[in-house]
A protein has these predicted regions:
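PLP-dependent amino-acid enzyme catalytic core
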Residues: 1-290
Length: 290
C-alpha cells in the first residue's frame, strides 16, 4: 500500500494544482484581467490554494466558505491577503456556491468555478496522472484510491490511468452519511473538503470501478493512526481515503499494489474533531507512571 502525499505542494494540499490551472487557463483565455478580483466558493483547501496563487500573480482574492469549516483555513487564506465571507451552515455547499455567484455578478469579479471548470481535471491529467505513471513505469499498480470533492483528481487521474493502464482498478470513497454516488441522500459530515450537497459537473460519475464509503470516526481514527504509526500527518479526508484503501486491500488478490491519494496535511484541522480528546496540557500523569 503506497500513498501520494499532496501536502508537499507549496500551499499544503492537492488543491494547489487546480488553483494554478484555473488562473493560468483564465489568463490565457483573457477571461481574467490584470488586477481583477478572483472569487470562489470553497471548503478551504481550494481557497488557501487560490489565495496563494492570486497573491503571487497579483490578484485580490475573496473566498466564500461555509461557517462549518475549520478556523485554520480562514487564517491561512487571510495570511495570503484574502478576504473570507462566511455563509450559514444550513445553506450547505450549494449555498456558498450561490453566494459566490451573486457576488461575482454584482462586483464584476472573476468566478473560478472549481466544480465545473474543465481546467480542473485537465491539470490532473497532465500533472498528477503523469507523475503517477512516471513513478510506476515498469512497476506493478493494481488499484488507485481517491475520494472526491470537486471530482477533479478522481476524474483526471482516473481517466488517464484507464487509458494508460486499463487493468488498474479505480476505487473512490465518500462519506458514509453523504454517499451521493451510491445514491444516498446528503447528510452533514465531518470529512471536510469531501462531497458537497451536489455532484459537481467536472466529476466523471462512471470512472470508478468501486465505491467504498467511510464514516467520520473511521476517517479520523485512521488519520490518527497514520501519524502515530507511520509518521505521516494528514487531514481527515486523507484518513478516509487510507481507510478505504485498507478495505480494498483486504479484498484484493495477494500481492496487489494499491496507491492512495492523501489530499492535505493535518495541520489545518487542529481545531476540529481530528484532535478531539487530545491532551493540550502537560503529560504529567504519563510521566509519573514511568
Amino acid at each position: 500500500l503506497l500513498v501520494k502525499v499532496e501536502s508537499f505542494n507549496p500551499g499544503g494540499s492537492v488543491k494547489d494544482r487546480l488553483a494554478l490551472a484555473i488562473i493560468i487557463d483564465a489568463e490565457k483565455r483573457g477571461t481574467l484581467k490584470p488586477g481583477q478580483t478572483v472569487i470562489e466558493a470553497t471548503s478551504g483547501n481550494t481557497g488557501v490554494a487560490l489565495a496563494m496563487v492570486c497573491a503571487a500573480r497579483g490578484y485580490p482574492f475573496v473566498a466564500v466558505m461555509s461557517e462549518t469549516f475549520s478556523i485554520e483555513r480562514r487564517k491561512l487564506m487571510r495570511a495570503y491577503g484574502a478576504k473570507v465571507i462566511l455563509t450559514p451552515a444550513a445553506e450547505r455547499g450549494s449555498g456558498m456556491v450561490r453566494r459566490a455567484q451573486e457576488l461575482a455578478e454584482k462586483h464584476g469579479w472573476f468566478l473560478a468555478r472549481q466544480f465545473e471548470n474543465p481546467a480542473n481535471p485537465a491539470y490532473h491529467r497532465s500533472t498528477t496522472a503523469a507523475e503517477i505513471l512516471q513513478d510506476f513505469a515498469g512497476r506493478q499498480l493494481d488499484y488507485f484510491v481517491s475520494g472526491w470533492g470537486t471530482g477533479g483528481t478522481l476524474t483526471g487521474v482516473g481517466e488517464m490511468l484507464k487509458l494508460a493502464r486499463p487493468d488498474v482498478k479505480i476505487v473512490t470513497t465518500e462519506p458514509a452519511g453523504a454517499a451521493l454516488l451510491a445514491g444516498k441522500e446528503w447528510q452533514p459530515h465531518k470529512i471536510q473538503g469531501w462531497t458537497p450537497d451536489f455532484i459537481p459537473a467536472v466529476l466523471n460519475r462512471t470512472i470508478a470501478d468501486e465505491n467504498i464509503p467511510v464514516d467520520d470516526i473511521t476517517a479520523r481514527d485512521t488519520a490518527r493512526r497514520l501519524a502515530s504509526e507511520e509518521g505521516v500527518f494528514v487531514g481527515i479526508s486523507a484518513g478516509a481515503t487510507l481507510a478505504a484503501a485498507l478495505i480494498a486491500a483486504e479484498n484484493a488478490p495477494e500481492g496487489s499494489v494499491i496507491l492512495a491519494m492523501l489530499p492535505d496535511t493535518g495541520e489545518r484541522y487542529l481545531s476540529t474533531f481530528l484532535f478531539e480528546g487530545v491532551n493540550e496540557g502537560s503529560d504529567d500523569e504519563w510521566l509519573a507512571a514511568q
